[in-house]
Amino acid sequence: MIRLENVSKTLSPRFTLAPLSLDFENGTTTVLIGPSGCGKSTVLRLLAGLVTPDSGTVKFGEETLQAGNAQDLRLRMGYVIQEGGLFPHLSVESNVALAARFLKRPEPEIRKRLDELCELVALSPALLKRYPRELSGGQRQRVALMRALMLDPGLLLLDEPLGALDPVTRHALQKDLKTIFARLGKTVIMVTHDMGEAAHFAGELILMRDGRIIQRGTLDDLLKRPADPYVTEFISAQRSPLERLGSAA
């Protein structure tokens, strides 16, 4: 289990992540939703050890994330951001295998893993020799996912992974990602501001606003048992994405 225990973080005079406690069961998919600037990405960065909490602790099982073990714990997680974050001067293969080669994993093991990941994300192995600029947006995000999965982490952190894609590519990758998550059985924590996208992926949603958790529950919980008027307001503003999701089911 992954836990945030009474964690807070002030990023600027205008934004503070209020003390919050969250736990994420192994093998589940949870989506953090809410408007831009509400603290969703800050939660991911805290989990990844990219920022240090002002108070509280981040725990992986019984281990507390701290400076001394942050690098080791990061090897257990994969991180995908909106634009992919690929190194433009490296080939696709070098981007994906970067961490494995830094850790001096055997080359036959790396080759085998590259083949497995190409099959998993439906990317042609021929693209491994290309550079990110030669790929479409959807292909770059598939490569970013491959890189995140290279070391077979138990945790995937996805920060708006589909946000920069056109609608057609986004829809296709959305379906593929859900299949991949189900196949891998990993703990997935994803950030989006799109309610339809959140409902597509998650068993459980966490709605945030102004650095606070407004409600945590299933889509049905949020629709039928809103804990705050803002829950209904947020969902109503995104009624069209939810209706599209329902019509596609």
Q: Where are each of the predicted segments found?
A:
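ABC ATPase "signature
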Residues: 216-217, 225
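Helix-to-loop junction immediately C-terminal to a conserved catalytic motif
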Residues: 48
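Conserved catalytic motifs of ABC-family nucleotide-binding domains
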Residues: 152
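Conserved ABC ATPase "signature" C-loop
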Residues: 210-211
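Conserved ABC ATPase signature
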Residues: 131-135, 139
